[in-house]
């Protein structure tokens, strides 16, 4: 067995180890307080868990919602061609009436108040009918639950015969969830018991728009549809009777004056419904004397002047055409005059960009001309000409607004097209008052859901009001003539009448 011999280096290491002084730098303190932790305490884990939970419940959904809104509001890619806009338009008339045959000399009911001086020479958006906040509010589960409970309470009151209480409760429920089918059905039943059949039927139609397979709504609507159709036919007949009465009245000085006033009223209301802030008196001053209204924009002035030019074109050119066909050029020429002063670049031009109208997105620009041709083909089709003129005019207005062929001026051009159809059928021009602006857009919104009848009723109601205005003026004039024995035009009115007739014959 070999034994390792001890060396000097071993002795040196041994002595060094024995003589080394302990140093604070070399001594490891085994203080439990300063030792690194081996894990997290229970309190720390709970606090971290609560913070993570709060972040997941509040901050993450907010971030996702914000990102979704940004993506949704960003420009969208071109969509595929939409389905055809051809509608089933025989929903009010029932039996198809015969095509209206106007007199040999087509009447012109708008008297141009401007003499021979020609004017030498704005973009408005359709109001958003509902915002993203409204959509979120309508779909809020808590509010929907409250609305359904309220509807059940209203149903119990309805069955007990307390209709006033039921209606009060349902008004609250409708404010909470206006698109819920159950709420709409209950409101329809209450209105039906109030003998408000048209409103009840409208509730059922909306319920089916949001839930097409709702069996209860289908049964209820099948019950109200024939009754409402009879009411609508009666309404249209009454408007036609008024038109016939108007056409048989003798023209007089009062009628001329009423036509003149109607001209100013039409220009004022049709631009005001798009947001123009000029008053009726200011509109008249611009048209009669070319006055510049202090504090009003040039664009608002140009909107009035453009509508004046479009009405002249309709009154003196389109109404005097030998044939009743409406062409794309007629629509473009009306629009060219509507925007001729406010936006000359876009006047009379089909849009080449995508536009957005609230929650509604019209067709992509590459399909606009195709859709416009469909509208014109529908207007000139023999079967279309057998439809009641009021229905036909309302549908044509809606179709043009649906396509939205221009970047601006679509509503004004659609109302001109509506009046062109009505006036060719013997009706005086229809004024859609700015005071009914909310009803105007609401009925168009319902049409987007698939029911055009509210908009047809809206047009018929204001057509009746326009005829009543003329008849009232003429009857008042007849009473005055019996008392005074004077039925002649004043020299100024005779001069204006002659100039207008000469201008129309020249085709201006």
From Swiss-Prot:
The record marks 274 as: Important for autoinhibition of adenylyltransferase activity. Changing residue 298 to D: Disrupts homodimer formation. Reduced adenylyltransferase activity. The active site is at 404. Pfam families: Fic (PF02661). Residues 326-461 form the Fido domain. Residues 496-508 have a biased composition (Basic and acidic residues). A motif (Inhibitory (S/T)XXXE(G/N) motif) lies at residues 270-275. Its EC number is 2.7.7.108, 3.1.4.-. The side chain of Glu-274 determines which of the two opposing activities (AMPylase or de-AMPylase) will take place. In response to endoplasmic reticulum stress, mediates de-AMPylase activity. Adenylyltransferase activity is inhibited by the inhibitory helix present at the N-terminus: Glu-274 binds ATP and competes with ATP-binding at Arg-415, thereby preventing adenylyltransferase activity. In unstressed cells, disengagement of Glu-274 promotes adenylyltransferase activity. GO terms for biological process: defense response to Gram-negative bacterium. GO terms for molecular function: AMPylase activity; ATP binding; hydrolase activity. It comes from the Eukaryota. One of its GO terms (cellular component) is nuclear membrane. It is a single-pass membrane protein. Gene3D superfamilies: Fido-like domain (1.10.3290.10), Tetratricopeptide repeat domain (1.25.40.10). Keywords: ATP-binding, Endoplasmic reticulum, Hydrolase, Membrane, Nucleotide-binding, Nucleotidyltransferase, Nucleus, Phosphoprotein, Repeat, TPR repeat, Transferase, Transmembrane, Transmembrane helix. Forms homodimers; homodimerization might be required for adenylyltransferase activity. The fido domain mediates the adenylyltransferase activity. This is Protein adenylyltransferase fic-1. It comes from Caenorhabditis elegans.
